[in-house]
């Protein structure tokens, strides 16, 4: 929205009449009068500043060319940017020279222009001719522009008329200020409910309904009508929708709806967080897992009580010793433990189900399938095999075991194969053996292996042996210590620097127990 201040010789604001507004830009002779009046103004500047007559003459020629350009642009875009003279085409330009001569002096700069400017708004639309679009500050800078016209012209001449060629806006502003029309245009946010608004075509837009302009509240009302329109469907489509709804309701009641990707991710993330919190390398513990864990703990406690050599202050240590004794006495058990160790350290489990169970029964079924994974691999007629999880192909199993054997051979070349007892203490729970759930010691996992002599020894894999320098035992603080029974400095909490077997310089391996690779 543009704003124009109108000034007469009485220094009062005189808004244009309706006839003047309707005749915007239709008088080309008026624009010519405007150019002649601006030339007179430049002559007045020369009379006031006789010292720079030559420079002023040059600047006058430049300003005349600018005036011509300005007039041409006004004539071309008379509807979008009319000059001031066309608004006062009824002989009012008789006062302009007197007025301009009066305001050449800086002491007579009227300060009430900006304070009492006209509140009327005239909309010229998007003004293609930007020569007349100065800022509001020109009303305050009239004195500077009028008094320093010569200095501005000198600057233009010193710069080889670059300013005149490039900055037509400044010359046009000087012309308007010399005429003292105070022709200040400021872009305003468009308001459609003014009493009288002139658009770029010269049509008057009034708020009394003469011109239907799309005001915001009208648009909002139409949008509300569109939103409230009902959705019409035929009977065939409606019956199809009803059938879909009924089928979905039935699946919801039976808890058989497939989870969306987002829900699946949320539940999977939640269960992984629980596993990390419990330090469990395998799957999430269910009631069946907990029952098997309790039974295993009871058996381990009984075996530890029967064996005086396995006496220890913690339940975890007695369980580990029990496993070691079983390994020494039973080759089948040792092989099974080796298989579990290999699965933990890189085989990726033994093909446990990836689905998120929707109830405890489903989770128990998955647990049973995973606990008998060796039977599923080797014997397709296993009685414990569930029909919901088909056995993997034997070629995949052979490939997996070959990969692990390669890695085990590389490790065994650097280590002692007789380090099985130490290795038994360090392995976290297998992701494939649900019955060998962990014993927790301050949140850290201690190894227990499932003993199932029914599994085929031919598919058992060799153990992963770690370096003798690092036995990777996890003590109560989660730090690696050398757990050598013959070493007197062997306290798991002992971080004595004098102990040559102490590995306190290594980073803590508490995350090792959570390795589910």
UniProtKB/Swiss-Prot annotation:
Biased composition (Polar residues): 1-11, 438-447
Compartments where located: Nucleus
Molecular functions (GO terms): DNA binding; DNA-binding transcription factor activity, RNA polymerase II-specific
Sequence motif Subunit association domain (SAD), location on chain: 232-255
SMART domains in the record: CBF
Ranges of compositional bias, category Low complexity: 26-81, 126-183, 304-345, 377-388, 408-423, 448-517
GO cellular component: CCAAT-binding factor complex
InterPro entries: CCAAT-binding_factor_CS (IPR018362), NFYA (IPR001289)
Renumbered residue ranges of the record's region Disordered: 1-95, 121-183, 252-281, 304-517
UniProt KW keywords: Activator, DNA-binding, Nucleus, Transcription, Transcription regulation
Acidic residues composition bias: residue spans: 359-371
Assembly with partners or alone: Heterotrimeric transcription factor composed of three components, nfyA, nfyB and nfyC. nfyB and nfyC must interact and dimerize for nfyA association and DNA binding.
Protein name: Nuclear transcription factor Y subunit alpha
Organism taxonomic ancestry: Eukaryota, Amoebozoa, Evosea, Eumycetozoa, Dictyostelia
